[in-house]
UniProtKB/Swiss-Prot annotation:
Subunit annotation: Homodimer; non-covalently linked.
Gene Ontology BP annotations: arachidonate secretion; lipid catabolic process; negative regulation of T cell proliferation; phospholipid metabolic process
SUPFAM superfamilies documented for this protein: Phospholipase A2, PLA2 (SSF48619)
Name used for this protein in its record: Basic phospholipase A2 homolog 4a
Region (Important for membrane-damaging activities in eukaryotes and bacteria): 121-133
InterPro entries with a match to the protein in the record: PLipase_A2, PLipase_A2_Asp_AS, PLipase_A2_dom, PLipase_A2_dom_sf, PLipase_A2_His_AS
Site, as annotated: Cationic membrane-docking site (MDoS): K128, K133
Recorded GO MF terms: calcium ion binding; calcium-dependent phospholipase A2 activity; phospholipid binding; toxin activity
Locations listed in the record: Secreted
């Protein structure tokens, strides 16, 4: 469990319900969140939003934009719960803010699965200083 915590911290900084996000990514992609996405491209992991290198990196960019658009909750502190039913992520929250946070994390996990064919090992540990600023969300 401690490894999963470290994995998710590296994946998205200290934002969101980190343990849940890591589980979602593992469930959807079958990949270890830390070793596969921890410092992937220009947007996965800690740091600002940059021009995505590929579809996988774009998923992380869109995820950061999703967090940025939240107004009624704090993705850095708030925690949610979800369930995995019939290989589908179900956000179980009644609280609208926590449900929105869960849906942002669900969307990135599904996006990463849908973009497994764009995953490029050359971006697996990509130096952020090669990244260019992206358009605003």
């Amino acid at each position: 469990m401690r490894t999963l915590w470290i994995v998710t911290v590296l994946l998205v900084g200290v934002e969101g319900s980190l343990v849940e996000l890591g589980k979602m990514i593992l469930q959807e992609t079958g990949k270890n969140p830390l070793t596969s996405y921890g410092v992937y491209g220009c947007n996965c992991g800690v740091g600002g939003r940059h021009k995505p290198k590929d579809g996988t990196d774009r998923c992380c960019y869109v995820h950061k934009c999703c967090y940025k658009k939240m107004t009624d909750c704090d993705p850095k502190k708030d925690r949610y719960s979800y369930s995995w039913k019939d290989k589908t992520i179900v956000c179980d929250e009644n609280n609208p803010c926590l449900k929105e946070l869960c849906e942002c994390d669900k969307a990135v996990a599904i996006c990463l699965r849908e973009n497994l064919d764009t995953y490029n090992k050359k971006y697996k540990i990509y130096p952020k200083f090669f990244c260019k600023k992206a358009e605003p969300c």
